[in-house]
Amino acid sequence: CQGFTFPQDVIKKADGSNHVGWCPHTDKKTGITYPSYVICWTCGLRTLREKMPKRLAESSYTAYFLDCVTATALYECYDPAHPLTRTTDRETRVKQFDYLTRELGLVAGSEQGRDWAVPVADYFEGVMSTTSFFANPKEIHAIPFETLSPDPAFARYEEYGFNPWRRVPLFQLVYGDCCETTWRWGDNSHRMPHLWWKKDL
């Protein structure tokens, strides 16, 4: 990633090792799999402040999406150059939103949503999608599904993702006046057309 230095900017675990991420990359030519790593949020804030003025000079963005900021757990970083407790990790992520919304005047959001980010985020992507979507038998990044028609393979997704007897939009009930929420990008309204009307409710 531009703006980051490896391995200096990676979160260090208590034993000094790099914190491995969740999206390993496999080289299609060699078959070798390379792990991904989690960047320390302190370094993320630094790089955000470095990049945004240049980005805004090139394109007049009015909104910005912070990938993973509210989708991952709070971490501890044991690197003496950028140490973090879980509390300071949360505070650093809040500063990223503050920078974008209060200093730059942008609309800013992230994935999944956390209550600690509600005061500083404008929207959360994916809050409306339930775990039944993420647990479906088709890889969630594959678009489109093999079929867009009703399919027994998606019975759990339909039952727990849409059935009003089971689905309680608790996050929206609590924070609906504070921020917007959306379906996950791969679980959008046109993913399964026969369910559009339920997603519009």
Regions found by a protein language model. Give the residues of each.
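Active-site-proximal substrate-binding groove within the catalytic cores of carbohydrate-active enzymes
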Residues: 30, 38-64, 68-201
